[in-house]
């Protein structure tokens, strides 16, 4: 049973790496750097998690495994706090609200996200020593205590936007993609709710069952977002698509 769970975990992780890499590249080809780079960040996080799991039991590589796991958790904090909820939302707004930020704005989105992730990681009990005496301050403890709720609120905001995104898909007749976004929204919100608050019955100390579900859900989300994005893009007038390809802002009725 344990071997079966391990295999399922590895398969789910590889699926997320593949989805993040492939659809990240596809978004980048559409010049949507927000969604493209965020998908790649998710893929890099999953890659670190994969090799951390593979090397954990290899003699002499325990330190490398822990470093890779730390990298994965930092990027996970980035994606949960800012990357998917805010950057993902902003990226999808390219086809719903004609939002096309400048390269400077793109950089600021990610710089702000990485800074926020750093704060969220450093307040964890195992990392507070980095802050010295300030690590035991009331402020640090307060940030750590509200962190799970912060993650949940941010993902819930993203789920609300996905509901709107699904409505836009139904509005243009893309029912299949509308339903795929609703499924992705429900699954993603379920994972976000379970993450810091509940345990799956029968799960082990490493939360293997949870991570199988989470990694699979995020892989599906990346795929569903890309094809839903393309579906709304197809509904735009030809002149709109031409402007989008050269990176010009565009407006359409209802945008």
Residue ranges and their predicted role:
Residues 1-19, 151:
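Hydrophobic transmembrane alpha-helical segments in integral membrane proteins
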Residues 18-27, 52-64, 68-112:
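Internal transmembrane alpha-helix with an interfacial aromatic "cap," most often the third helix
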Residues 28-44, 101-110, 174-184, 237-240:
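Membrane-interfacial loop-to-transmembrane alpha-helix junctions, especially the N-terminal start
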Residues 36-61, 183-198:
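Hydrophobic alpha-helical transmembrane segments of multi-pass membrane proteins
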Residues 53-67, 121-140, 193-205:
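Juxtamembrane "helix-exit" motif on the non-cytosolic side of transmembrane helices
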Residues 65-78, 140-151, 204-215:
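Non-cytosolic membrane-interface motifs at loop->transmembrane helix junctions
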Residues 80-167:
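Membrane-proximal helix-loop-helix units in multi-pass membrane proteins
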Residues 161-255:
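C-terminal transmembrane-bundle signature of multipass membrane proteins
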């Amino acid at each position: 049973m344990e071997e079966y769970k391990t295999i399922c975990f590895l398969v789910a992780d590889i699926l997320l790496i593949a989805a993040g890499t492939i659809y990240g590249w596809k978004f980048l080809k559409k010049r949507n750097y927000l969604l493209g780079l965020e998908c790649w960040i998710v893929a890099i996080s999953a890659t670190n998690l994969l090799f951390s799991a593979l090397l954990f039991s290899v003699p002499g590589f325990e330190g490398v495994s822990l470093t890779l796991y730390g990298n994965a958790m930092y990027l996970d904090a980035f994606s949960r706090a800012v990357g998917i909820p805010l950057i993902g939302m902003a990226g999808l707004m390219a086809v719903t609200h004609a939002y096309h930020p400048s390269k400077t704005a793109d950089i600021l989105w990610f710089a702000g996200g990485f800074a926020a992730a750093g704060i969220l990681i450093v307040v964890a009990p195992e990392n507070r020593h980095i802050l010295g005496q300030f690590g035991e301050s009331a402020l640090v403890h307060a940030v750590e205590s509200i962190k799970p709720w912060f993650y949940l609120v941010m993902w819930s905001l993203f789920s609300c936007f996905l509901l709107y995104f699904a409505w836009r898909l139904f509005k243009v007749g893309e029912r299949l993609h509308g339903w795929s976004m609703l499924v992705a929204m429900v699954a993603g919100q379920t994972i976000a709710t379970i993450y810091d608050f509940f345990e799956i019955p029968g799960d082990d100390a490493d939360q293997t069952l949870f991570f199988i579900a989470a990694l699979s859900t995020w892989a599906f989300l990346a795929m569903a977002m890309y094809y839903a994005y393309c579906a709304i893009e197809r509904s735009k007038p030809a002149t709109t698509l031409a402007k989008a390809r050269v990176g010009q802002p565009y407006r359409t009725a209802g945008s």
